[in-house]
Swiss-Prot record:
Pathway: Protein modification; protein ubiquitination. It is an enzyme of class 2 (transferase). It catalyses: S-ubiquitinyl-[E2 ubiquitin-conjugating enzyme]-L-cysteine + [acceptor protein]-L-lysine = [E2 ubiquitin-conjugating enzyme]-L-cysteine + N(6)-ubiquitinyl-[acceptor protein]-L-lysine. Belongs to the TNF receptor-associated factor family. A subfamily. E3 ubiquitin ligase that, together with UBE2N and UBE2V1, mediates the synthesis of 'Lys-63'-linked-polyubiquitin chains conjugated to proteins, such as IKBKG, IRAK1, AKT1 and AKT2. Also mediates ubiquitination of free/unanchored polyubiquitin chain that leads to MAP3K7 activation. GO terms for molecular function: signaling adaptor activity; tumor necrosis factor receptor binding; ubiquitin protein ligase activity; ubiquitin-protein transferase activity; zinc ion binding. Homotrimer. Homooligomer. Interacts with tifa. The MATH/TRAF domain binds to receptor cytoplasmic domains. It comes from Xenopus laevis. This is TNF receptor-associated factor 6-A. Pfam families: TRAF-mep_MATH, TRAF6_Z2, zf-C3HC4_2, zf-TRAF. A zinc finger (RING-type) spans 72-111. One of its GO terms (biological process) is lipopolysaccharide-mediated signaling pathway. Residues 384-533 form the MATH domain.
């Protein structure tokens, strides 16, 4: 009876026969069922050597809650590696072994004499416990599974805390990849200038010293890589302050490099006097102080500062030595004066060439501007009444509008045909403080003086279609469109008497700025405005007057 119903025999625990029957039933259980235990595959000797005293019951949340018959009386948790005593009580293997070794050989429940060799594994209870469903202990995870599958789930659970291998921080597994690729301060990155690999948090510091990074000259605002900047300061920068080349003779002037030539030209006589004064000081200087000066190469001449004091008469060299030194100094001065004259001529020639080049550059700029105007005029003639206005840098215009700065821009002129009327568009971003039209895009059409005004009938009559284009990739684009007919009695459509008619015609509330966010009206920071004009050449045809219907897309 106890073999067929082992649960009853285990729960009773009142008679020695019942305990023996439970032991017999457990021993008959298939070894495949024992494999549910983490230590089932280990040899018996290995299992005995494990530090089982440190392993208590399963501290997990069961769903439904754990029945009391599966609780260990010692650790009050679910039985782990359940064993049964001859007196019919169940314990975790580690718990009862620790109790027997620390508290003596007795059962903790009824104080019956109990030896370690009397314990036997309760595989039936073990299998029952491993079949119970438990909740994942990781915060945020709602999965439940059998206890035997919990360890495998914890390995794969996306809500488990794992350590970042780069910064050693703790993160949820599902967020680890994003952290390591985009957020980790120690993630690997490369300098945009020199290509050096480094941690992301070190990049900003590296940019301050990167030899290949572009920096701006403090004087001329030229952009150069950092390693070129010292040579630029000392050799090329026309705005860098430099001392006069005669500073060693006593000139204390400092000027920008491009002003050096003018300074040398204006102070030639002063420089000569400084040189003469310096040379006179040599005549009263001991030979030992000037013996190091080589008079063979004037390019290497290094004058002694003016602060050198005259020597005591007792140390004066002989008259013959002074005469020879004076002759050498005079030769040096003559050579330097010759060099100065040649350099003065070279400077004058360079100034003349520079003026010629400046004139030539100005002529080229004028030619370029003329060509640009011609190209723009050709484009205006070629549009044939359909004009697309590309407004670049639209985010900057919106920022100015948000700062209560007026934003009014005009498009280039365009023709309705060849010959045709010349028109332009005006876009106005209404300020947030504007009454009745705050934060709206206003769009108007203006007539302009064109090449064919004398050949065309006035006032202008036709239909004008204004659109702000949806730049999304989908086929179901939703352009913001308004259509209006011209009104001949308005000044906006009369022949203009100024380059651009100050009177325009259009919509004050063409489109709300918030509508731009609903579709991709702005792409690559560019807004596209399309104007299509259909001219009515038959002056006797009836014209549509009165209220002009508006598209429903422009309303909020």
């Amino acid at each position: 009876m106890s073999i067929l119903n082992p649960r009853t025999s285990l729960e009773a625990g009142d008679s020695e026969d019942a305990c023996c029957a439970a032991m017999a039933s457990v021993c008959c259980i298939n070894t495949k069922e024992d494999a549910d235990s983490p230590s089932a595959g280990l040899p018996s000797g290995t299992t005995q050597n494990l530090d089982v005293e440190e392993i208590q019951g399963y501290d997990v949340e069961f769903d439904p809650p754990l029945e009391s018959k599966y609780e260990c009386p010692i650790c009050l948790m679910a039985l782990r590696e359940a064993v049964q005593t001859p007196c019919g009580h169940r314990f975790c293997k580690a718990c009862i072994l620790k109790s027997l070794r620390n508290a003596g050989h007795k059962c903790p429940v009824d104080n019956e004499i109990l030896m370690e060799k009397q314990l036997f594994p309760d595989n039936f209870a073990k299998r029952e416990i491993l079949s119970l469903r438990v909740k994942c202990p990781n915060l945020g995870c709602t999965d439940t599974m059998e206890l035997r599958h919990l360890e495998h789930h914890l390995v794969q659970c996306q809500f488990a805390s794992v350590e970042c291998s780069q910064c050693q921080g703790s993160f949820l597994k599902l967020l680890l990849d994003k952290h390591m690729e985009h957020e980790c301060g120690r993630r690997r990155t490369f300098c945009d200038n020199c290509g050096l690999a480094m941690a992301y948090e070190d990049k900003s510091g590296h940019e301050l010293i990167c030899p290949m990074a572009y920096v701006t000259c403090d004087y001329c605002q030229t952009n150069l890589i950092r390693e070129q900047m010292p040579a630029h300061y000392s050799m090329d920068c026309t705005m860098a302050p430099i001392p006069c080349m005669y500073c060693e003779f006593g000139c204390r002037e400092k000027m920008q490099r491009h002003n050096l030539a003018g300074h040398l030209q204006d102070f030639t006589q002063a420089h000569m006097r400084m040189m003469a004064q310096t040379l006179r000081s040599f005549s009263t200087t001991p030979t030992s102080h000037i013996s190091d000066i080589s008079f063979c190469d004037p390019n290497q001449f290094e004058p002694v500062p003016l602060s050198v004091a005259p020597a005591h008469p007792s140390h004066m060299p002989s008259q013959q030595d002074c005469s020879q030194e004076t002759r050498n100094l005079r030769e040096t001065v003559e050579q330097l004066e010759g060099r100065l004259v040649r350099q003065d001529h070279q400077i004058r020639e360079l100034i003349a060439k520079m003026e010629t080049q400046c004139t030539y550059v100005n002529e080229l700029k004028h030619t370029i501007h003329s060509l640009e105007d011609k190209v723009a005029d050709m484009d205006a003639h070629r549009c044939n009444g359909v004009f697309i206005w590309r407004i670049k840098g639209f985010s900057g215009l919106q920022k100015s509008q948000e700062e209560e700065k007026p934003v009014v821009i005009h498009s280039p002129g365009f023709y309705t045909g060849d010959p045709g009327y010349k028109l332009c568009l005006r876009l106005h971003l209404q300020l947030p403080s504007a009454q009745r039209c705050a934060n709206y895009i206003s769009l108007f059409v203006h007539t302009m003086q064109g090449d064919y005004d004398s050949l065309l009938p006035w006032p202008l009559q036709g239909t004008i279609r204004l659109s702000i284009l949806d730049q999304s990739e989908s086929t179901a684009r939703q352009d913001q469109v308004e259509v209006m007919d011209t009104k001949p009695d308005l000044l906006a459509f009369q022949r203009p008497t100024a380059p651009r008619n100050p009177k325009g015609f259009g919509y004050v509330t063409f489109m709300h700025l918030n509508t731009l966010k609903q579709r991709q009206y702005v792409k690559n920071d560019t807004l596209l405005v399309r104007c299509s004009v259909n001219i009515h050449l038959d002056l006797t045809s009836p014209r549509r007057e009165g209220f002009q219907p508006r598209s429903g897309e422009g309303t909020l």
